[in-house]
């Protein structure tokens, strides 16, 4: 008994094909640091983008030291990865208020806004990915007569 051995040619998926076909982006020259602000929840982040090697300095700490959560790190790097500029700029940021999630969202918004000032033709891609939208959700205030914003005390009929 002989079995026919079929050889399959594996076509690259669209993601692999586009990643292989993407030409390396030419370096962008900026004459001064780009400064932007991002906000989310109670967090406010001021960012300075300068030409460099992809280093993050967040209040004097590295990205990994300030945000140990890998999800937050990916969230922050997403705009730079999208426009293929992860190793083109150094990011210096001052973070105020909020918690880790709010600060990460504010930092992502500030970086995306800075990238537009550097290269305006990147705007449609950043806009489509949702990186330029300021998330308006914030904590709802507590109302008197209630235990929390919407939680009412237990009701007793008799």
From Swiss-Prot:
Source lineage: Bacteria, Bacillati, Actinomycetota, Actinomycetes, Mycobacteriales
Region described as Disordered: 1-20
UniProt record similarity statement: Belongs to the universal ribosomal protein uS9 family.
Name of the protein described by the UniProt record: Small ribosomal subunit protein uS9
PANTHER family tied to this protein: RIBOSOMAL PROTEIN S9, SMALL RIBOSOMAL SUBUNIT PROTEIN US9M
Pfam families: Ribosomal_S9 (PF00380)
Molecular-function GO terms, alphabetical: RNA binding; structural constituent of ribosome
Domain of life of the source: Bacteria
Gene field: rpsI
Keyword Ribonucleoprotein tagged: yes
Keyword Ribonucleoprotein part of the UniProt annotation: yes
BP-aspect Gene Ontology terms: translation
InterPro entries: Ribosomal_Su5_D2-typ_SF, Ribosomal_uS9, Ribosomal_uS9_bac/plastid, Ribosomal_uS9_CS, Ribsml_uS5_D2-typ_fold_subgr
Compositionally skewed regions (Low complexity) per UniProt: 10-20
């Amino acid at each position: 008994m002989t079995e026919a051995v079929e050889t399959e040619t594996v076509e690259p998926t669209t993601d692999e094909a586009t990643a292989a076909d993407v030409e390396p982006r030419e370096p962008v020259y900026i004459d001064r640091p780009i400064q932007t602000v991002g906000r989310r929840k109670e967090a406010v982040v001021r960012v300075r983008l300068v030409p460099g090697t992809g280093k993050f300095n967040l209040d004097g700490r590295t990205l990994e030291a300030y945000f140990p959560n890998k999800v937050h790190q990916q969230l922050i790097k997403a705009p730079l990865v999208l426009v293929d500029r992860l190793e083109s700029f150094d990011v210096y940021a001052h973070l105020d208020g909020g918690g880790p999630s709010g600060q990460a969202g504010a930092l992502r918004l500030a970086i995306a806004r800075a990238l537009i000032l550097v290269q305006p033709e990147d705007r449609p891609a950043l806009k489509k990915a949702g990186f330029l939208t300021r998330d308006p959700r914030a904590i709802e205030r507590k109302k008197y007569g209630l235990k929390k914003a919407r939680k009412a005390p237990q009701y007793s009929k008799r």
